[in-house]
C-alpha cells in the first residue's frame, strides 16, 4: 500500500482539552493506551471487575473471551459509550475520560462495531464524512471535495467502490469495508475492531489483514476482538484474555497455542473440541438427485444416512445456504428429485418440510431466527405452538414443561423462561433456537453456520449436541465457513463453488487443502 492509509479529511473542529484533545505523548510511557482498575456494574450484574489492559503503538492486541466475559463492555468504555464506575484510562501516558463517543473519536479512538452503523439511504462519501462535511466558500456542503477525499481514501485502502454509491446497495462485506474506511478517515491512533471478519469472504479477510498491517506500520494501535483463533495467531502481537468480567492475563501471541488460549478463556481444558463418533451405519434417509434452482445452483446430488453428519463447505456465494433453503421449502427447486425415507417428495413450503421431519437453523439468528422482544419460552415454542393450541386455549403447562426440559438437555443458561431472549449470550440464544427445532422431533436437521459469533465454550456445547443427536439416529446437514469445524464434525464433506457441487470427500480423505481447492473451483484429481 503506497503512502498513508488515510485521506486528507475535511477540517476538524477545535477540541476542548477536557475531552483529551491536544494530548502530547509522554516520552517515558511505552504504551499508547492503558486501562487501570476499571470496574463497571449494571443493575444486578457486575460486567467488569477491576480489569486492566495495555496497548503498544504499532501493535495488534487480540481480545479474547467467551460471550459475557466483558470484552464489549470494556470496548464501549474506551470508545466513550459507557463511563466506568471506577478506574482510569490513560491515552499516550495522560489520564483521560470520555463523556461521549464523539469525545473519544476526537481524542483519537475509533471503534468499528460488529453491528454496522451506516445510513443505507446515504452515499459512501456522505457516510464517511457525516458530521465533518467540508464546506465551500458559501458555507454549503462541498460534495466535490468530499468525493475527492473519499476516492483517495478508498484507493489507498484498495477498496474498489464508487464514493457516490448508496450504502443500501452494498453487500454486508462491502459495508464492513466502508466502516473500516470511515474509522481510518479519522486518522485515529487507536482502532477497535469488533468481529470484523464475521460476514466477509476469505479474500476480503486477507484484504483486511493487509490494511491492518499497513496501519500497524504507521504506529497505530489496534484492538482486535474475535472468536477465531486462527486469526489471532495470524495477525496479533499480543493476546489479552477476559473471563466473567475479570482480566485473566496478557501474553505474546507467539508464546501461545490453541490449547493454552482455550484454557485461559474458559477456565478449564477442552481436551476434545470435536467429539469422537462412530461411523454412521444407518439407512439412507434423504436422497437428492440433480436438484437445481435457476441462476443459483445446479445438479446438486447427495445421499444422507440416518445418524450421519454431512458438512457443506464453500466460499460466500457458493450456493450452500440456497440448497438448505430449497430443502426446507423456502425457495422450491426448479428441477431435480428429493426422496425422503424412500418416497419421492415435493417440498413447496416450510410447513410441508416441518411435517415431513425437516428442521432448519438459519445462518443469521438475529435476522431470521430470533424474536428479540419476546421471552426465551416464546421463542422456543414458536414452531410447536399450533400443536398445543385448540378450541381457543393454549396448553401452557405442557408447553412450559417441554421448554424447561429442553433448557436442561441443551444447558441453556437463562435466569428464567420469561427472560427476554435478547439479553442472553450468543451461545445461549443459539441453543434456545436449536431447542425450538428439536421440539418438532425432526429426522433431518439442517444447521447453517451453527456456531457463528459464539465463543469457544459455547461451540464445544453445540458440537456435543450435534454429536449426541447424530448418535441417536438424526441425520444432520451442517453448513459452515470454518474449515476446522467442517472437518472436525463431518462424516463426509460436500464442497460447492458458484452453485456447482464440486465433489464429496469422505472424512478420511478430507483436508483443508483439498476442501479449499474444490471451493476455489478446481477439481481434485
UniProtKB/Swiss-Prot annotation:
Give the subcellular location: Cell inner membrane
| Reaction catalysis annotation | D-ribose(out) + ATP + H2O = D-ribose(in) + ADP + phosphate + H(+); D-galactose(out) + ATP + H2O = D-galactose(in) + ADP + phosphate + H(+)
- InterPro entries the record matches: AAA+_ATPase, ABC_carbohydrate_import_ATPase, ABC_transporter-like_ATP-bd, ABC_transporter-like_CS, P-loop_NTPase
Q: Name one GO cellular component term.
A: plasma membrane
Q: What Enzyme Commission number does this protein have? A: 7.5.2.11, 7.5.2.7
Q: How does it sit in the membrane?
A: Peripheral membrane protein
Location of region: Disordered: 1-20
Q: Cystine bridges: which residues? A: none
Q: Mind telling me which Pfam families this protein's record contains?
A: ABC_tran
Give the primary localization class: membrane
Question: What are the transmembrane regions?
Answer: none
SMART domains, alphabetically?
AAA
Please tell me whether the keyword Flavoprotein is annotated for this protein: no
Query: Where does this protein hold ATP?
Result: 65-72
The keyword Repeat is assigned to this record: yes
Q: Which family does it belong to?
A: Belongs to the ABC transporter superfamily. Carbohydrate importer 2 (CUT2) (TC 3.A.1.2) family.
The protein's role, per its UniProt record: Part of an ABC transporter complex involved in carbohydrate import. Could be involved in ribose, galactose and/or methyl galactoside import. Responsible for energy coupling to the transport system.
State what protein this is by name.
Answer: Putative ribose/galactose/methyl galactoside import ATP-binding protein
Source species: Pseudomonas syringae pv. tomato (strain ATCC BAA-871 / DC3000)
- Lineage of the organism: Bacteria, Pseudomonadati, Pseudomonadota, Gammaproteobacteria, Pseudomonadales
Amino acid at each position: 500500500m503506497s503512502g498513508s492509509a488515510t485521506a486528507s479529511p475535511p477540517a476538524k473542529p477545535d477540541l476542548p482539552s477536557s475531552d483529551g484533545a491536544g494530548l502530547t505523548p509522554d516520552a517515558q510511557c511505552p504504551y499508547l493506551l492503558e486501562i487501570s482498575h476499571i470496574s463497571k456494574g449494571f443493575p444486578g450484574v457486575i460486567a467488569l471487575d477491576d480489569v486492566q489492559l495495555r496497548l503498544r503503538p504499532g501493535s495488534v492486541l487480540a481480545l479474547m473471551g467467551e460471550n459475557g466475559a466483558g470484552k464489549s463492555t470494556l470496548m464501549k468504555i474506551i470508545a466513550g459509550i459507557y463511563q466506568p464506575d471506577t478506574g482510569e484510562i490513560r491515552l499516550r501516558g495522560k489520564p483521560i475520560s470520555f463523556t461521549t463517543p464523539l469525545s473519544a473519536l476526537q481524542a483519537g479512538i475509533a471503534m468499528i462495531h460488529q453491528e454496522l452503523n451506516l445510513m443505507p439511504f446515504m452515499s459512501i462519501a456522505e457516510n464517511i464524512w457525516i458530521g465533518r462535511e467540508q464546506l465551500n466558500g458559501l458555507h454549503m456542503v462541498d460534495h466535490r471535495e468530499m468525493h475527492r477525499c473519499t476516492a483517495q481514501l478508498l484507493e489507498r485502502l484498495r477498496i474498489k467502490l464508487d464514493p457516490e454509491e448508496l450504502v443500501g446497495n452494498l453487500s454486508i462485506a462491502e459495508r464492513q469495508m466502508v466502516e473500516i474506511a470511515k474509522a481510518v478517515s479519522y486518522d485515529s491512533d487507536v482502532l477497535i475492531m469488533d468481529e470484523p471478519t464475521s460476514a466477509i469472504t476469505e479474500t476480503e479477510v486477507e484484504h483486511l489483514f493487509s490494511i491492518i498491517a499497513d496501519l500497524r506500520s504507521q504506529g497505530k494501535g489496534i484492538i482486535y476482538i474475535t472468536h477465531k483463533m486462527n486469526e489471532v495467531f495470524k495477525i496479533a502481537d499480543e493476546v489479552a484474555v477476559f473471563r466473567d468480567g475479570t482480566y485473566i492475563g496478557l501474553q505474546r501471541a507467539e508464546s501461545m497455542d490453541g490449547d493454552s488460549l482455550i484454557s485461559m478463556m474458559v477456565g478449564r481444558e477442552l481436551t476434545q473440541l470435536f467429539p469422537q463418533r462412530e461411523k454412521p451405519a444407518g439407512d439412507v434417509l434423504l436422497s437428492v438427485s440433480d436438484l437445481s434452482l435457476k441462476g443459483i445452483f445446479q445438479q446438486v446430488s447427495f445421499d444422507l444416512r440416518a445418524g450421519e453428519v454431512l458438512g457443506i463447505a464453500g466460499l460466500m456465494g457458493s450456493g450452500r445456504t440456497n440448497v438448505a433453503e430449497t430443502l426446507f421449502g423456502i425457495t422450491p427447486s426448479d428441477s431435480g428429485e428429493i426422496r425422503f425415507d424412500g418416497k419421492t417428495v415435493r417440498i413447496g413450503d416450510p410447513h410441508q418440510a416441518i411435517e415431513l421431519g425437516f428442521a432448519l437453523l438459519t445462518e443469521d439468528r438475529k435476522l431470521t431466527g430470533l424474536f428479540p422482544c419476546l421471552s426465551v419460552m416464546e421463542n422456543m415454542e414458536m414452531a410447536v405452538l399450533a400443536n398445543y393450541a385448540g378450541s381457543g386455549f393454549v396448553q401452557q403447562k405442557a408447553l412450559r414443561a417441554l421448554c424447561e426440559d429442553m433448557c436442561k438437555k441443551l444447558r441453556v443458561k437463562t435466569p428464567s423462561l420469561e427472560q427476554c431472549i435478547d439479553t442472553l449470550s450468543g451461545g445461549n440464544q443459539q441453543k434456545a433456537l436449536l431447542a425450538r427445532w428439536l421440539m418438532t422431533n425432526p429426522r433431518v436437521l439442517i444447521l447453517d453456520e451453527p456456531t457463528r459469533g459464539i465463543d469457544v465454550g459455547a461451540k464445544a456445547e453445540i458440537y456435543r449436541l450435534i454429536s449426541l443427536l447424530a448418535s441417536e439416529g438424526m441425520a444432520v446437514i451442517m453448513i459452515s465457513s470454518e474449515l476446522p469445524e467442517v472437518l472436525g464434525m463431518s462424516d463426509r464433506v460436500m464442497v460447492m463453488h458458484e452453485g456447482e457441487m464440486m465433489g464429496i470427500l469422505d472424512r478420511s480423505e478430507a483436508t483443508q487443502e483439498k476442501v479449499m481447492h474444490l471451493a476455489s473451483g478446481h477439481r481434485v484429481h
